[in-house]
């Protein structure tokens, strides 16, 4: 396990938890004073009441909850969202409603999950030529159905 410091921005905020021993993500909950309705085909920025600190060897990814996606067409808009190790502000989640019905978020609702992920930094080396591959410049759909 890797230590992550977490700060509740209000005493009423509930800390994220792993729901099972095999879960890779902790559920994030909305921390809002009043319910938020997300209209179809729109998004809303949902606060969690939490801020965190962790090693620069990691990032935290914010990902959708599969149950919200399959049951309500709700997802995290910028999936995965990235929380950098040097960010100290409140974690907020952009929730998007792909569905045709309003979606109501209440205080304490589980809205997304956060996963701690290792970061491998790149060292760029500029070149005028790249090695050849069989695929070459074949892009979208080039490898088949």
Language model segments and positions:
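DUTPase catalytic domain/fold
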Residues: 1-145
């Amino acid at each position: 396990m890797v230590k992550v410091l977490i700060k509740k921005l209000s005493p009423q905020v509930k800390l994220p938890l792993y729901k099972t021993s095999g879960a890779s993500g902790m559920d994030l909950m909305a921390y809002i004073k009043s319910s938020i309705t997300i209209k179809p085909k729109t998004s809303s920025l949902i606060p969690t009441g939490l801020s965190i600190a962790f090693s620069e060897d990691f990032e935290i990814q914010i990902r959708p909850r599969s149950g919200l996606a399959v049951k309500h067409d709700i997802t995290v808009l910028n999936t995965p969202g990235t929380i950098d190790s040097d960010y100290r502000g409140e974690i907020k989640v952009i929730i998007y409603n792909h569905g045709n019905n309003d979606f109501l978020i209440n205080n304490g609702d589980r809205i997304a999950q956060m996963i701690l992920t290792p970061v491998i930094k790149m060292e760029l080396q500029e070149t005028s030529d790249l090695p050849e591959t069989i695929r070459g410049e074949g892009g979208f759909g080039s490898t088949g159905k």
